[in-house]
Amino acid sequence: MENQRSSPLSFPSVPQEETLRQAPAGLPRETLFQSRVLPPKEIPSLSPTIPRQGSLPQTSSAPKQETSGRMPHVLQKGPSLLCSAASEQETSLQGPLASQEGTQYPPPAAAEQEVSLLSHSPHHQEAPVHSPEAPEKDPLTLSPTVPETDMDPLLQSPVSQKDTPFQISSAVQKEQPLPTAEITRLAVWAAVQAVERKLEAQAMRLLTLEGRTGTNEKKIADCEKTAVEFANHLESKWVVLGTLLQEYGLLQRRLENMENLLKNRNFWILRLPPGSNGEVPKVPVTFDDVAVHFSEQEWGNLSEWQKELYKNVMRGNYESLVSMDYAISKPDLMSQMERGERPTMQEQEDSEEGETPTDPSAAHDGIVIKIEVQTNDEGSESLETPEPLMGQVEEHGFQDSELGDPCGEQPDLDMQEPENTLEESTEGSSEFSELKQMLVQQRNCTEGIVIKTEEQDEEEEEEEEDELPQHLQSLGQLSGRYEASMYQTPLPGEMSPEGEESPPPLQLGNPAVKRLAPSVHGERHLSENRGASSQQQRNRRGERPFTCMECGKSFRLKINLIIHQRNHIKEGPYECAECEISFRHKQQLTLHQRIHRVRGGCVSPERGPTFNPKHALKPRPKSPSSGSGGGGPKPYKCPECDSSFSHKSSLTKHQITHTGERPYTCPECKKSFRLHISLVIHQRVHAGKHEVSFICSLCGKSFSRPSHLLRHQRTHTGERPFKCPECEKSFSEKSKLTNHCRVHSRERPHACPECGKSFIRKHHLLEHRRIHTGERPYHCAECGKRFTQKHHLLEHQRAHTGERPYPCTHCAKCFRYKQSLKYHLRTHTGE
């Protein structure tokens, strides 16, 4: 009986997969593979006893109640490992097992029958499992008489069967902490590895943040540098803007002055040459040059309206000088008139009174104007309010009947040379007809002012022929009730210098003003009283300080030298086919030919000669452009453009324009020119001869030729006289129109001799040929890199300056190159 109680229980083996599926959660996988733990459902003591098919019937219910809560010992092959819950339950059940020593078991025959049934059961195909003690009615309880050879060898022990259950239980208890420590160690090791991985991830993120921080710091430094550069750039822009505002103010003031001049009809001042640095024109006259003084007796003999007229004339002259920024102090004469006092005379007036210069050289160049004030003998003052003054201008050839006299009296006409009339040189001129209309006929039967003109004698004319600016000189302006301005009138042969597309600048001369004061007993001539300028003194001494560098001629006035030098740069005169007289401008020729059409020649039988050939240019050989003006046979024709010429040399020069030949080369800079005169003008740049320069009065730029100045002035006026007949585009230069027309005609006249590629413009060909020659004339001053084209250098320099001139209209980004902006715009448009 004791042996039966101490015999261990034997349980059938359970598959490993089922053991892993029903193992406790805290037990590691490796331990489960080494131990074979039976699930609770296979342990009879942990589950209620259920009859199975083939099991023995239960004989008693009493043992069932005692063994229902009992946990048998479980042994396996290999290391014995049990879960903690099973071991605790087994330990708690050792007491009841010890108290059941007297329990009766079924007879051996029944036990053997039960074992045989269990061995044939489908649930027990493996080796049988023995249980040490089992209740009598438990179907799994084995008989104590089972041979030891049929038992598991691991369960055989020399220890007594009585002590075996307790020793196995203590061994299980000793082996139980080992998997728990191992599990804890593995869990800690896994947790440490997880923490290390997190630390590594955090370290990587920290390094990434440090890199991004460094990048941001660099960007901030670049932004600060850009901000400093932008501030410096902005400061320079502010300086430039201040300069522009200052220039704008100066330009605004000049425009106001020009409006005043146009309002006062002072056109002569617009033709004055400006200063070398762009300052205001140098007015060659002073207020005293155009002022008229009266003695006390003469002033007393004047009527009130005459005094008012005198004041208006003086005031108009003063305003004309001030309107052009002419820095003069206010004359005493104007101050006296504003205070209502009598204008006092200078000290020289008394000594010079009554003197009339007889030497023509002592007088000023041009015409002499006399102002004659007439009164009748009675000196009647019956009219309280005198009518306007009757002013009559005797321009040689104007008859008295043209002006008329309501009182039937013809005023005295003091004519020195009636045979030389002004109409000779003013036929066909519109300015004198305007002057004639401006002379308002102011009638008074008792007194009047007659403006008379005198010309210098023929000998003086011949002497001063080259000095005259080829225009009549103007006196100034008469304002108030009576206005009459003597403007420069172009002569038919000298309306404009050659090479220009517009008439030449009019220059103010210094006409001698003769004053005839009123006298009760008759007409009395008074001398002109004014201060002699340095220019007048040179004229009296006969000095000619201005010399032409080309031909050696000298002149008294610089403007005469400038006009004369235009003869040297003339490229194409216009000749009259009837009298072989040449002119500088086509308009002059048209005016001259009008004489032949109207009067049949240069001489009028009624009024004498109407045209003085001395005022025209002397006949000279025709130039290539003479084919456009004048008549005559032209046997030499150009096979390229069908132009005809009268001389073979003219045709040869013209053909150079088609061949592109430039036979004249500068020895200093190796620049070549098509015409010799172009080379001469270019060499003045090297020689430093800047006297012959044409300066723009608006911006101060100087040019070597008047045509270049005229072309430049179109940039200020915005004029575009050359229009394309196909697309109606307009251009300021004819060459630009020619190049534009090639776009429509698809003409490409400039071909590369090496690769045959053709271009519309010549400078495009020059840029292209640098590809073959390897020339790179444009180099960067910062890094020394060289480029073939200038705009490539400008684009490259933006990398050094940081300039980004192309902003995006959709966002705030700016770009250095235009192509980059185009690529960026596609992100907005979605192309």
From Swiss-Prot:
Superkingdom field: Eukaryota
Coiled-coil residue spans: none
Chain residue numbers at which the record places covalent cross-link Glycyl lysine isopeptide (Lys-Gly) (interchain with G-Cter in SUMO2): 330, 452
Biased composition (Basic and acidic residues): 123-139
GO CC entries: nucleus
Region (Disordered): 1-143, 339-364, 398-432, 488-545, 600-634
Subunit structure: Heterooligomer with ZNF746.
Entry similarity comment: Belongs to the krueppel C2H2-type zinc-finger protein family.
Protein name, entry field: Zinc finger protein 777
Lineage, opening ranks: Eukaryota, Metazoa, Chordata, Craniata, Vertebrata
Name of the encoding gene: ZNF777
